[in-house]
UniProtKB/Swiss-Prot annotation:
<dbReference type="GO" id="GO:0005737">
    <property type="term" value="C:cytoplasm"/>
</dbReference>
<feature type="compositionally biased region" description="Polar residues">
    <location>
        <begin position="1212"/>
        <end position="1223"/>
    </location>
</feature>
<feature type="region of interest" description="Disordered">
    <location>
        <begin position="892"/>
        <end position="936"/>
    </location>
</feature>
<dbReference type="InterPro" id="IPR033646">
    <property type="entry name" value="CLU-central"/>
</dbReference>
<feature type="compositionally biased region" description="Basic and acidic residues">
    <location>
        <begin position="631"/>
        <end position="641"/>
    </location>
</feature>
<dbReference type="Pfam" id="PF13236">
    <property type="entry name" value="CLU"/>
</dbReference>
<dbReference type="Pfam" id="PF13424">
    <property type="entry name" value="TPR_12"/>
</dbReference>
<feature type="repeat" description="TPR">
    <location>
        <begin position="1003"/>
        <end position="1036"/>
    </location>
</feature>
<dbReference type="Pfam" id="PF12807">
    <property type="entry name" value="eIF3_p135"/>
</dbReference>
<comment type="function">
    <text>mRNA-binding protein involved in proper cytoplasmic distribution of mitochondria.</text>
</comment>
<protein>
    <recommendedName>
        <fullName>Clustered mitochondria protein homolog</fullName>
    </recommendedName>
</protein>
<dbReference type="InterPro" id="IPR019734">
    <property type="entry name" value="TPR_rpt"/>
</dbReference>
<dbReference type="InterPro" id="IPR028275">
    <property type="entry name" value="CLU_N"/>
</dbReference>
<dbReference type="Pfam" id="PF13374">
    <property type="entry name" value="TPR_10"/>
</dbReference>
<feature type="region of interest" description="Disordered">
    <location>
        <begin position="631"/>
        <end position="669"/>
    </location>
</feature>
<comment type="subunit">
    <text>May associate with the eukaryotic translation initiation factor 3 (eIF-3) complex.</text>
</comment>
<comment type="similarity">
    <text>Belongs to the CLU family.</text>
</comment>
Length: 1282
């Protein structure tokens, strides 16, 4: 049954009716995870339909509901349906009795399928009237973009719809060369140049037609608010509406609804007009349709325009912060034009009320009461995790906004007499401080540098504790933002943290007080800290106070326990939950001192080391058993006569086969224990010999863990990348994700770059990428140093000057900072030292920073090998820059392009300047800055349109949805397909309910599920999920993120599998264009993509084009892997086939011979690849002349050969860091990825369309019912048929 809660489809302006932030369903869609919720097994909630009776047209609607939905979810469905979204203030009745909004439908008396409930309009309150106005403005398209401190320009942008529709690229910047495929091209790859320059227009929003205007304006009236005596009569607000006909109406918002009043701009008379103009209605939407004849038609056109977009592209963010693009349209573009909107300054009042108290929340109490919610049943867990996810999202949003204000100096400190770094702030019930050593806490650890690192580590520690979710242990809400060079920490206020204790009492109840001099202990903390330490592999250990007294602690001495005045046990300062990386410091003899002593091992490394040691333990146990068994058998044989011994040995052999293996596999690991002491090497002094011996053992274990990182983890990563066993990183972000996944700290970039250099040319791309990332990170540290004490008005001047010194030296070797001197005078205490920076000084500073922080020496000519655009992007993402789009000139030859760019200097082009006729709508674009007569530079301050905060949060992931996903995967691996798919759908629904639709975790799940469905040969479901993965990835991680590229590539693969090859090529082209921007040409993983493109072109019988793409792939492969590699031979094999199909038989023979020779040398004559190449070579050689004349006829006569190397099948793109073992399921599900099990005959039929693809199976409609989360899409999500 298809679920759409009625007969009309959703409006695009409103949330999906199963809005994850409002729905409180226990188990989604009535499906239960296997093995869970047995207590509800008999209830089987299911879906059923009810009728809602309305007071106005259409008078009745049908709504699909579930027993376990709450009544407020039904309300939300009604509010979001196009026929009923004018209702906001109402209640529901059943059998004449009012239904409580917060009960489940199963608790409503006598409510059965097809029952009728009645919608009854309620009187408005002042708050409901304000919310009604905000909602109606959004519905009718009258609200402009909100400007705030957190969401930047084009936040949450998605390009998928524009790419899929083949829309023209933005004209905000001129193309360097018009090489894009036009609408008449045979396919999307026509004109694409593999080594060509990056086109920045690829990541800009396409030009959009303006939306239909429904009203000219709708706002609060100048007569608002009502005077006291009229408030007593029920007047709530006064509004002013100007219709498209040009008529202005003054409207009174009354407790009973809305009516047109008799006010004018100069006369106050807020009472209803006389008939026949006495328009009134309960809903403002209805009233506007009464006073404006054109409203209904224009509103319908607006809905139609919105319905053309995918719902996910317009869906509002609920549980995550949208991604801010680093490159945005220039200020001259209509996309970023600032437009007049009288209601924009009124929105704070409309949303938060007169005194703003409606948005003030007790964050800490909300966090802790949410943690204390029951978690006994599945429904309890779902409700608890959904509330947790929403709460963290709200807190992160509020804390980030407050932190920006603190960083800009707009919040008064609580201690204004202290130094700037020591000041603390409270804003919106959140406690803020700077990530600097204002009071000398970290003086011995590295001062400000140590404090800055410690607060970031603390957030990671809080996140780890939140994920463990230990009952009885609480953490404050914690997040960190980096903004304008400052690091600001935001924490929820723990009750009692500011309380002055009695003399003799400590501020802290467990752990170190005032550094490590005094140790506090409280027995109530021991049980919960014991659980925490066990989960984090932390060893219980002694510490000593300043008097040498011994104290046994469960955690690091740096980790604090505080008993709040609310009676809860809080854990604070979680920056030292893993040991110090001692080998890093001991290795500093040959290097300059590291800036701080806060360099600890990552939790992922500790977990990896634990698994490694456990593996060793299991091997030793198995070896012991084998040895013991062998000795027992030998003794038994010795004690028996010869005849019996012979018989016994035969029996023993057979029994050994049956029993030994399972016994050896089962090893009890409960005796295996490994925990690390986080306080070794940090100044503790053991007192007795026994203590010293124990401490030495702890130190040895930590050294072994550090050595494991250096001697095993680092070389293994380099080897995996060398062998192509993991997806190759594309930019700084994907590189750091890869390192962190393996437990490698970013400080090891230098060590990794040195190891990559030793591997030679094959890892040259990795060395370049790591060098680029080190330069970007060093630049970030330097920029932060100059920005920290600089007035915010000069931030763009500082950044533009530093960028000119790094990236613009070929345009101007002696750039000068552009500063408004008159503005400088009003900031006498500002630090303007950035003006003194020169390209030479900056280069030396970067080299120094890299040497200190990464222990790596750059080549003398490193500046000449910079990839300017990619480095600019990395720097922008690290500093939160949003740059105006233009063709940035990185050398003098590019200046011409820049000069003619509309965004470069702001002047009109000759064509524009020559026209005297005023263009329609030109008054809406923002004015352009006047051209500066200053010398040419690459960057000017006006290029930096915005700076957004970089947020680090402590939000935990959903354990429940991950468990369901893992259970589904295991079931599929065990060939329990139906159960596996059921659990996976369960996980999908849980993800969407808990995180909301727009969240990075949901994007990752869509990506994973699309691959699972593709492997299960459910191609339509794979396409639908891959499309969703693309959109959600773009909006939450960035339109040019590495994840977005992978999502586009997999979507192209799935589209091709369903027969939409031309669409697939559109996606491939877009992904390749993105690749050029974030990495440049010739990325190692692009070989797979180019091969896939070539195969798709063969599928379309475009053999010459296919041949070109194989040749391009071969060029990249030879450059990366060398001429004599198996990879190169594989592509030569494919290219030979392509050449044969392109009727170039001589070249085909030569390429196949090259492939054969490489296979022979590298793999030997008996290898399958060698034999297949030999077989093909014989056939091609014998039939060279005939193939050239008629390839199909000749090949149809060829005998069937053994399996052929692939090379004509498309392959999925591995995710960055994904190992081949992680893709093993794909190989099992689809056969060996490197082999194509078809004969030459079949290959020819495949290439020429004889076996294009399996017909698309029609999916059962019930699939939509199983996942109503996806009901809002234009097409119902296709699920696998069972």
């Amino acid at each position: 049954m298809e679920q759409n809660n009625g007969t009309t489809e959703h409006p695009k302006e409103v949330l999906d009716q199963t809005n994850p932030s409002n729905e409180v369903t226990g188990v989604p869609n009535g499906n239960h995870a296997e093995g869970e919720g047995d207590q509800n097994a008999g209830e089987a909630p299911g879906l059923f339909q009810i009728t809602v009776k309305l007071p106005h047209e259409p008078y009745k609607i049908q709504v699909m509901v579930s027993n376990q939905e709450q009544v407020q979810d039904v309300r939300q469905s009604i509010v979001e349906l196009p026929g009923t979204f004018q209702y906001t203030s109402f209640h529901l009745e059943h059998n004449g009795e009012r239904i409580n909004d917060y009960v489940e439908l199963s608790e409503v008396k006598d409510l059965k399928p097809d029952a009728e409930i009645v919608l009854v309009e309620d009187p408005y309150t002042e708050k409901e009237a304000r919310m009604h106005l905000v909602r109606i403005r959004e519905l009718i398209g009258a609200s402009g973009d909100r400007v705030d401190n957190l969401h930047g320009i084009c936040a949450g942008l998605s390009l998928h719809d524009s790419v899929a529709a083949g829309e023209q690229l933005s004209d905000d910047i001129p193309s360097k060369e018009e090489n894009s495929a036009n609408g008449t091209a045979e396919h999307a790859l026509v004109g694409y140049e593999v080594p060509g320059p990056a086109d920045l227009r690829t990541i800009l929003p396409r030009k959009q037609a303006p939306f239909p205007k429904t009203v000219k304006s709708i706002s609060l009236s100048p007569w608002n608010p009502p005077p006291y005596h009229l408030r007593q009569k029920g007047h709530l607000l006064y509004l002013q509406v100007t219709t498209n006909e040009g008529e202005q109406y003054q409207i009174t918002s009354h407790v009973s609804g809305f009516f047109v009043n008799k006010c004018s701009n100069s006369k106050f008379d807020p009472f209803p007009r006389a008939a026949p103009k006495n328009y009134s209605a309960h809903s403002l939407l209805t009233l506007i349709s009464l006073i404006s004849p054109s409203f209904e038609n224009s509103f319908k056109a607006l809905q139609e325009a919105n319905n053309k977009k995918d719902l996910l592209t317009t869906f509002p963010f609920q549980n995550s912060i949208p991604h801010n693009p680093w490159l945005v349209p220039p200020t001259s573009s209509p996309a970023t034009a600032h437009q007049s909107d009288i209601t924009r300054p009124q929105e704070n009042y409309l949303i938060a009320g007169v005194d703003n108290s409606e948005t003030l929340r007790d964050w800490n109490e909300e966090f802790q009461t949410t943690r204390e919610l029951p978690r006994d049943t599945v429904q309890d867990k779902v409700f608890r995790e959904r509330l947790t996810s929403k709460l963290f999202a709200d807190y992160n949003d509020a804390a980030a906004r407050g932190a920006v204000l603190v960083a800009r100096g707009e919040v008064a400190p609580l201690n204004p007499t202290e130094g700037r770094d020591a000041q603390i702030f409270v804003y919106n019930n959140i406690f803020f401080s700077f990530g600097a050593d204002g009071v000398g806490t970290f003086a011995s650890e590295g001062g400000d540098e140590a404090a800055r690192v410690a607060v970031a580590k603390d957030v990671m520690g809080v996140k780890a504790v939140n994920q463990l979710d230990i009952a009885g242990l609480f953490t404050p809400g914690t997040m960190v933002i980096d903004y304008l060079g400052k690091r600001v920490v935001g924490q929820s206020i723990v009750p009692g943290i500011f309380k002055q204790r009695e003399p003799g009492e400590h501020q802290i109840d467990y752990g170190g007080v005032d550094g490590k001099d005094v140790i506090a202990k409280h027995e109530a903390f021991v049980p919960v800290f014991e659980k925490l330490s066990k989960a984090l592999r932390v060893k219980k250990h002694p510490v000593w106070d300043k008097d040498g007294a011994r104290h046994e602690l469960e955690s690091s001495v740096e980790t604090k326990g505080l008993l709040g005045t609310d009676g809860r046990k809080y854990v604070l300062d979680l920056y030292r939950i893993t040991p110090l990386d001692v080998l890093w410091y001991e290795d500093s003899e040959n290097h300059e001192p590291y800036p701080h002593r806060m360099s600890v091992l990552r939790l992922e490394l500790v977990e990896s080391y634990w698994r490694f040691k456990m593996g060793q333990y299991v091997k030793e146990e198995v070896e012991k058993r084998r040895k013991a068994k062998k000795e027992a058998e030998e003794k038994a044989e010795e004690s028996k006569p010869n005849g019996e011994a012979a018989d016994a040995s035969e029996n023993a052999e057979s029994e050994k086969k049956e029993t030994t293996s399972p016994d050896q596999e089962r090893v009890d690991i409960s005796d295996f224990k490994l925990a690390l002491n986080p306080d070794v090497f940090s100044g503790q002094v053991p007192q007795t010999d026994e203590e010293k011996e124990e401490w030495a053992q702890d130190e040895k274990e930590v050294r072994d863990a550090c050595n494991y990182l250096r001697s095993k983890v680092l070389p293994e990563l380099i080897q995996d990348l060398h062998d192509g066993d993991v997806g190759f990183p594309m930019d700084g972000q994907s590189l750091s994700q890869l390192l962190h996944k393996r437990g490698i700290n970013v400080r090891y970039l230098g060590k990794l770059a040195a190891l990559a250099k030793e591997k030679g040319a094959r890892l040259q791309a990795l060395t370049a990428l790591m060098t680029q990332d080190m330069v970007a990170r060093a630049f970030k540290h330097i920029a932060n140093r100059y920005l920290r004490n600089l007035p915010s008005a000069f931030a763009t001047s500082c950044i533009a000057h530093l960028l000119n010194c790094l990236l613009g030296t070929e345009v101007n070797s002696k750039p000068r900072a552009e500063i408004d001197e008159s503005l400088r005078e009003i900031y006498p205490e500002g630090d303007f030292s950035f003006e003194q920076v020169t390209p030479t000084a900056l280069k030396e500073d970067i080299e120094k920073q890299i040497k200190i922080r990464y222990r790596f020496s750059l080549d003398a000519d490193w500046t000449s090998s910079l990839r300017h655009l990619q480095l600019l992007r990395d720097i922008s993402l690290k500093l939160g820059l949003q740059l105006g789009a233009k063709n940035y000139a990185f050398d003098r030859s590019q200046l011409k392009n820049q000069d003619h760019s509309p965004a470069a200097n702001g002047t009109r082009t000759p064509e524009e300047g020559g026209k005297k006729k005023k263009k329609k709508g030109s008054d809406q674009a923002s004015p352009r800055p006047a051209q500066s007569p200053a010398p040419a530079v690459t960057f000017v301050p006006d290029d930096i349109l915005n700076i957004v905060p970089i947020v680090k949060d402590a939000s935990p992931r959903s354990a429940l949805s991950e468990e369901a996903l893992e259970a589904g995967r295991i079931s599929l691996m065990q060939n329990q397909k139906e159960l596996g798919q059921e659990l996976i759908l369960e996980s999908l629904s849980l993800h969407e309910q808990i995180y909301g639709i727009l969240h990075p975790e949901v994007a990752k799940l869509y990506h994973q599920l699309s691959m699972l469905y593709y492997q299960s040969d459910d191609k339509d479901a794979a396409v639908e999920l891959a499309r969703k993965a693309v959109i959600v990835t773009e909006r939450t991680m960035g339109v040019d993120s590495a994840d977005a590229i992978l999502s586009y590539l997999n979507l192209s693969l799935f589209e091709h599998a369903t027969g939409n090859t031309k669409v697939a090529l559109v996606y491939i082209r877009h992904a390749l264009e993105l690749w050029k921007i974030i990495y440049g040409p010739n990325h190692p993983d692009s070989i797979t993509t180019m091969n896939n493109a070539a195969v798709m072109l063969q599928h379309l019988k475009l053999y010459p084009d296919s041949r070109k793409w194989f040749e391009a792939s071969l060029t990249v492969c030879e450059e990366l892997f060398g001429r004599q590699s198996v990879n190169t031979a594989t592509i030569l094999f494919q290219l030979a086939q392509a050449l044969a199909l392109d009727q170039d038989s001589k070249a085909a023979v030569n390429r196949m011979r090259d492939a054969y020779n490489i296979f022979l040398n590298e793999l030997g004559p008996e290898d399958r690849n060698t034999k297949e190449a030999e077989s093909w070579l014989e056939q091609l050689t014998q039939n060279a002349v005939y193939i050239a004349k008629h390839a199909k006829d000749i090949q149809a006569r060829r005998r069937r050969l053994a399996n052929l190397p692939t090379r004509l099948g498309t392959k999925p793109q591995p995710q960055v860091g994904q190992t081949t073992s992680e893709m093993a399921n794909a190989a099992e599900a689809r056969g060996n990825a490197s082999l194509d099990p078809r004969s030459i005959d079949e290959l020819l039929k495949f290439i020429e369309g004889g076996e294009s693809s399996a017909p698309r199976t029609k999916q059962k409609k019930r699939a939509a019912a199983r996942n109503p989360k996806l009901r809002g899409s234009k097409q119902s999500t296709v699920k696998p048929s069972s």
